[in-house]
């Protein structure tokens, strides 16, 4: 059977070791004779899963003790609403950094609950997309918080700078980059991430919230989105997505076994450098992102002749390179190379790209 590499932007590739372990345990988990999908979320067996997965995540990210970790429903889009409902307090505005599609989506949702101060930081120089440096962001004085997305999956635009905005409450949508390398959690009031890229399967959302920000939710916030309610109930106010939680816990263990986030950072850098080098040394492939803002997780690229796009995708699929079609907004190709994608997968892709150019260039 041909080795398959899944370059989907999400739901994304999961580590094969995790999938194999889940397969082995699926019908008889821990000798119980049942699946982990079938046991009560309030059973001592699942509570052990929940507690261990949180501890492994805390170890990986070195999460300070004054932060709560919440395992939530609803995807990152639910957090677009949860954030203003939980954090505005008596204020009516928040700073929203507009760096691309997902940042703008958060702004659109926030408009239902407050008056966002939208700060457009996108740049385009010589046809290359980029982001203004943080020192040029014009933040307001009275905002409840500052929200930004450090990695835009559609355009492949990244913000590698870490925020240093004094005592401002900073919110980061880390859906596509969390666990791809070390992260100083203490710089943020809230970090949130949908699971389906670097954490686990779709259906789970991670929220890391500083404790002093709890207790400020509006009266009308739905209980399932209230950070204080979720924290007080250990993320079990209602039945959580237990199988997604279990699988995410296996991913956390896998990351620790691989050497942690410093090691993942090295691997991700090597993968991205190989792919970008293949693009840059060719006139056949093109990147539309400025060097300073290229994503390590999502690499869009275009062919010089778009008429060859369908041929490229068809031939790639035939040799096991799946889900390379770019987002409809951008077109072309996109390779998402999250933690679970091995260097061998990227090497197979770049070898194919070189051969495709030789035959069609």
Swiss-Prot record:
Record key words, sorted? Amino-acid biosynthesis, Aminotransferase, Cytoplasm, Pyridoxal phosphate, Pyridoxine biosynthesis, Serine biosynthesis, Transferase
Q: Which E.C. number(s) belong to this protein?
A: 2.6.1.52
Its EC top class is transferase
- Species lineage, top-down? Bacteria, Pseudomonadati, Pseudomonadota, Gammaproteobacteria, Enterobacterales
Q: This protein's superkingdom?
A: Bacteria
Q: Entry's InterPro entries?
A: Aminotrans_V_dom, Aminotrans_V_PyrdxlP_BS, Pser_aminoTfrase, PyrdxlP-dep_Trfase, PyrdxlP-dep_Trfase_major, PyrdxlP-dep_Trfase_small
- Give any Gene Ontology cellular component: cytoplasm
Catalysis performed (reactions): O-phospho-L-serine + 2-oxoglutarate = 3-phosphooxypyruvate + L-glutamate; 4-(phosphooxy)-L-threonine + 2-oxoglutarate = (R)-3-hydroxy-2-oxo-4-phosphooxybutanoate + L-glutamate
Protein's name in the database: Phosphoserine aminotransferase
